[in-house]
């Protein structure tokens, strides 16, 4: 019996040692002694910590076998207050007390934004509603164009691309009274200078000679490389309109580009982005019935002719004495058809002649540096985008040099210059007789769009440069095929744009007294 009691005593002794736990406890208050509920208290370098309760107290239970008997650093933090740390000797068992008294962080409480003039100010001192957009979120969006990268980044900001072409313009609207009843866009400010972001459409029903029918222009905001942007502020309110007049009635988008690093020596960064685009789903098209109507082959607009599978097969019967068409490269001749025998269909071939896998690549290189008296940033961005429609593309090269010089304790000079060269071609897609998809979708399944341009010969007379389409399979003496061959739309009715643009902002800041700045800006 005595031996059993000894064993139980020894077992209880070791069990008590095993269950012994160390803890750190205490309170977190402000400088007036008021408790701070929800403050975080963490053992630095670990995930061990606790939050204060309603009375400002906390207790951290130290896991067994971790830091017992060691000196650790305890860190406490609370929104709007300066963080504080202290060294604590953790006992092997039992608890130790550590109290914290935090000071208000006056700087941290000030929400800084950029006003419509490009100056930094506290949000609560502005007469306008503002939203901030993180520049990192914009570049991570994967969008090729700066305007499109603003989508879903700020409340009440509506971003609508005008088309799917590479480099196509984008409409930006800030929700409000003006955007409900109108279509005006906000004013765009880049480094304190207003720029244009217009959206322009070409003519609507242009078939032969026009170069902008149904195609959209570029947006000037997309001349900016998103990787050069430091911050974006969206402003709406009376103060925005007061500064810029009626141009800011629909709000202001304020863009600030990056400055050079003031410390740490020269820094170089390189970034490459690459993506591919494909048509998500094709429009199903029938390949049972040939061109014509009432069960007979013909050159009418409809595709309710004879049943293709019931044809005899082989070559069509033609009349070589009648008008004919010769392709521009001389490899194809089409005579007047008198009897349709061929069972060939071209739905897939015609589709593939219009669409492709799009590709986007962007290379960005930046060099920045400086010291206490000067900073600099140089960047080069190279964007190349081929659209899902063949021959559509958008190429852009960006060069930027931003410098800042502190001439004295009171005078600072800042210069920001960005040069852009962009080149693009966008395809006509409007709902008109020259529209790309109208021509493609209306093409009969038994007509090959490949040979779209050539010479029409009739009665010994040659008509060169004729447009061949499914309703004018010989081209004809007229230049009007009624509905375009979609390959003609791609190859012959280009909407090309070449832009050279320089955006500059030069600023001198003079601070004669503390809290007073005199700014001279030109650009």
Locations of the language-model features?
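Short, acidic, small-residue-rich periplasmic hinge/interaction motif at the N-terminus
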Residues: 29-32, 39-44, 73-82, 91-139, ...
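Short, polar/charged loop or turn motifs at beta-strand boundaries
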Residues: 28-31, 129-152, 160-164, 172-179, ...
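Residues embedded in well-ordered regular secondary structure
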Residues: 132, 153, 165-170, 180-186, ...
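N-terminal periplasmic accessory domains that precede
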Residues: 96-101, 111, 146-149, 172-175, ...
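N-terminal periplasmic "start-of-domain" segments of outer-membrane beta-barrel proteins
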Residues: 48-57, 113-141, 167-171, 199-215, ...
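Periplasmic N-terminal soluble interaction domains immediately after the signal peptide in Gram-negative
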Residues: 47-48, 53-111, 245-247, 257-259
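Cleavable N-terminal targeting peptides that direct proteins into the secretory/outer-membrane pathway or into
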Residues: 1-23, 68, 82-84
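Transmembrane beta-barrel strand/turn architecture of Gram-negative outer membrane proteins
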Residues: 155-157, 171, 228-231, 241, ...
């Amino acid at each position: 019996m005595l031996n059993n009691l000894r064993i139980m005593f020894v077992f209880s002794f070791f069990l008590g040692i095993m269950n012994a736990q160390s803890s750190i406890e205490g309170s977190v208050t402000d400088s007036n002694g008021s408790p701070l509920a929800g403050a975080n208290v963490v053992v630095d370098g670990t995930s061990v910590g606790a939050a204060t309760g309603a009375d400002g107290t906390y207790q951290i239970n130290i896991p067994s076998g971790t830091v017992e008997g060691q000196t650790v650093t305890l860190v406490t933090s609370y929104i709007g207050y300066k963080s504080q740390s202290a060294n604590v000797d953790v006992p092997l068992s039992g608890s130790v007390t550590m109290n914290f008294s935090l000071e208000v962080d006056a700087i941290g409480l000030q929400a800084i934004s950029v006003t419509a003039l490009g100056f930094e100010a506290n949000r609560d001192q502005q007469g306008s509603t503002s939203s901030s957009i993180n520049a990192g979120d914009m570049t991570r969006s994967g969008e090729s164009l700066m305007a499109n990268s603003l989508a879903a980044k700020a409340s009440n900001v509506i971003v609508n691309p005008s088309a799917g072409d590479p480099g196509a313009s984008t409409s930006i609207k800030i929700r409000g009274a003006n955007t409900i009843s109108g279509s005006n866009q906000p004013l765009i400010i880049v480094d304190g200078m207003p720029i244009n972001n217009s959206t322009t459409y070409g003519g609507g029903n242009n078939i032969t000679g026009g170069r902008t029918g149904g195609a959209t222009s570029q947006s000037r905001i997309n001349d900016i490389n998103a990787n050069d942007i430091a911050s974006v502020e969206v402003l709406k309110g009376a103060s925005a309109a007061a500064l810029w007049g009626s141009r800011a009635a629909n709000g202001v988008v304020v863009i600030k580009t990056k400055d050079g690093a003031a410390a740490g020596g020269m820094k170089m960064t390189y970034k490459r982005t690459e993506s591919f685009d494909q048509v998500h789903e094709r429009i199903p098209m029938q390949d049972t019935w040939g061109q014509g109507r009432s069960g007979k082959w013909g050159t009418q607009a409809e595709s309710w002719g004879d049943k293709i599978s019931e044809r005899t097969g082989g070559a069509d019967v033609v009349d070589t004495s009648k008008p004919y068409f010769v392709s521009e490269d001389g490899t194809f001749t089409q005579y007047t058809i008198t009897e349709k025998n061929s069972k060939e269909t071209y739905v897939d071939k015609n589709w593939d002649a219009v669409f492709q896998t799009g590709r986007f690549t962007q290379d960005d290189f930046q060099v920045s540096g400086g010291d206490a008296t000067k900073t600099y940033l140089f960047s080069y961005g190279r964007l190349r985008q081929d659209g899902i429609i063949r021959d559509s593309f958008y190429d852009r090269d960006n060069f930027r040099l931003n410098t800042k010089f502190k001439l004295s304790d009171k005078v600072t000079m800042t210069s920001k210059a960005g040069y852009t060269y962009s080149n693009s071609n966008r395809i006509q897609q409007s709902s008109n007789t020259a529209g790309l998809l109208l021509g493609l979708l209306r093409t009969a399944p038994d007509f090959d769009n490949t040979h779209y341009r050539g010479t029409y010969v009739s009665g010994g007379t040659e008509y060169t440069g004729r447009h061949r389409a499914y309703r004018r399979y010989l081209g004809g003496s007229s230049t009007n095929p009624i509905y375009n061959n979609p390959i003609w739309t791609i190859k012959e009715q280009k909407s090309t744009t070449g832009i050279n643009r320089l955006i500059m902002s030069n600023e001198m800041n003079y601070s004669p007294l503390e809290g007073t700045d005199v700014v001279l800006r030109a650009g």
